[in-house]
Swiss-Prot record:
Threonyl lysine isopeptide (Lys-Thr) (interchain with T-311), cross-linked positions: 161
GO cellular component labels: extracellular region; pilus
NCBIfam families: srtB_sig_QVPTGV, strep_pil_rpt
Subcellular location: Secreted, Cell wall; Fimbrium
Organism phylogeny: Bacteria, Bacillati, Bacillota, Bacilli, Lactobacillales
Keywords from the named record: Cell wall, Fimbrium, Isopeptide bond, Peptidoglycan-anchor, Secreted, Signal
Name this protein carries in UniProt: Pilin
Top-level taxon of origin: Bacteria
Residue numbers covered by the propeptide annotation in the UniProt entry: 312-340
Keyword Magnesium among record annotations: no
PTM text: Proteolytically processed and assembled in pili through a transpeptidation reaction catalyzed by the sortase C1. The last pilin subunit is cross-linked to the peptidoglycan.
Amino acid sequence: MKLRHLLLTGAALTSFAATTVHGETVVNGAKLTVTKNLDLVNSNALIPNTDFTFKIEPDTTVNEDGNKFKGVALNTPMTKVTYTNSDKGGSNTKTAEFDFSEVTFEKPGVYYYKVTEEKIDKVPGVSYDTTSYTVQVHVLWNEEQQKPVATYIVGYKEGSKVPIQFKNSLDSTTLTVKKKVSGTGGDRSKDFNFGLTLKANQYYKASEKVMIEKTTKGGQAPVQTEASIDQLYHFTLKDGESIKVTNLPVGVDYVVTEDDYKSEKYTTNVEVSPQDGAVKNIAGNSTEQETSTDKDMTITFTNKKDFEVPTGVAMTVAPYIALGIVAVGGALYFVKKKNA
C-alpha cells in the first residue's frame, strides 16, 4: 500500500512539475498564509481600529488543459486581520489563512485562484494594495483518505518570487495652532487660554493619545506634551507662540476654542489655512468643527486691541495743533517772501 502511495505521489509531482513557479513560494499542506504589512509614514502614528479583508476566488481566466483547472470555490472565501489602537511599535505585521482542506476536489490537478484585498472598510489615511496574486493549489491523490486533497500551494505575483504579502501605508497629519496679537493696545506678553477637543470615532477610541509640541519665543527647543482624544486639552499661547499636533490621525473631527476676551477690549479673528487649500476666516474665538485630512492644517488666532484717544484729551490738544499749523504756515510764507 505504501509503495503504491509513493508511486502515485511521485508520478503526480513529476506531472505537475512544469506548473511550479518558484520554490521559494511553495507551502506544504492545505493552508495558504496571507501576510499584511501596515507601514507607518509617521512612526508615532496611531493605528486605527479596523479590519483588512482578503478574498480568494477561482481564476476564471485559466484555460483548462490536462491537469490545469479553474479553482473550486471555498466555503469561506474571505479572511481578515484585525488592528486596534493598541497595536504599536513592532506589531504592524499580521497574517491570515485560507484553508483548502474544506474544499472537495473531484480529481488531482493544479487548481488556480486569485487573491485580492477587499476595500470593505476604507479607513481615512490608509492606502490600499491593489495587487492580485495567483495561487496554484496542487491536489494529489491521498491514499489514506481515498480522495484528492490539497497537498501543497504556490502563491505568487507575476514576475515575482515573493510570497503573498499585501502592503498598506498609514499616513497621519499635523495641526498647528498659532497666536498673533496686534494693535496699539495688544499685550504681547499675555498668556491667552485655549482648548482643543479631538473627537473619538469608530477608528480611534477615547483616551488614545496624540503628541503635541509647543514652540515659544526665543529659540528654545519645543516642549512636548500629550493630549487625549475626547478630553479637553488646555493650553496657553503668547504672541508668536504655537502648538503642533504632530501625529493627528486623518479623519478625526476637532474644535479649537480660545477664551472670550471681549471684556478686555480684544476682537478675535480665526484664520483656518489647510495646506494647498482655500483660507477660511471666522470672526470669533472658535473654529467650526473641522475634520483632519491628509493635508497639514494651520489655524491662526489673532487678537487685536487698539487704544482710543480720550475725547477730552483730543479737545484739549486740538487748539494747540491748530496754532502749530498756523505758525508753520506763517514761517513758510515769510521765508518764501524774503527769498523773492
